Structures are given as structure tokens and as C-alpha cells.
Amino acid sequence: MQVLVRDNNVDQALKALKKKMQREGIFREMKLRGHYEKPSEKKAREKAEAVRRARKLARKKMQREGLLPMKPKPVFGAGPGAGRGGPAAGPRGPR
């Protein structure tokens, strides 16, 4: 995998490399290959992933058909940290 470094901007090149690796699924594969996974565990994990995908597809289909309410869009400034320390406050209070 190659990434061009323009104007000695290594940070930008590193960001592009990480994005490519994420798209290719390299990080996920490294995590899975970090330790041995028994064939039975692999089968169970893949089955659970398939069930999750099927549920997600069914949920999206029901939302499109109007049988389920759509997920509310996040409103900035009205989240869990609103009113505690200004705009820089996150979920754990002011910085």
C-alpha cells in the first residue's frame, strides 16, 4: 500500500494511510489475528455477525416503510453536557 507525501506533510500522509487501511479492513484483521481463534469460536462469531447484519437490515427496512420511528438526529448544544461549563463541556463536564 502506498501513500504520497506532499510538501513533507507526513501527518496528512499518515491520515491518508490510516483511512486506506480502515477501508481495506486491515485493522480489523490485525485485531482478529492477534490471538488464535478456534474454528468453533470463529463460526460462532461469524454467525453472530450475520444475525446482527440481518437485524440491522430488517430495522432499516421497517423504518423506510414507516413501521418504526426514525432515529432522532443529534441536536448540537442540547446533549448530556448542556448547561455545564459552556460549549467545551463534554459528557464528563468541563475540560
Swiss-Prot record:
This is Small ribosomal subunit protein bS21. HAMAP family: Ribosomal_bS21. Residues 78-88 have a biased composition (Gly residues). It holds the Pfam family Ribosomal_S21. GO terms for biological process: translation. Belongs to the bacterial ribosomal protein bS21 family. Signal peptide: none annotated. Keywords: Ribonucleoprotein, Ribosomal protein. Residues 56-95 are annotated as: Disordered. PANTHER family: MITOCHONDRIAL 28S RIBOSOMAL PROTEIN S21 (PTHR21109), SMALL RIBOSOMAL SUBUNIT PROTEIN BS21M (PTHR21109:SF0). One of its GO terms (cellular component) is ribosome. NCBIfam families: S21p.
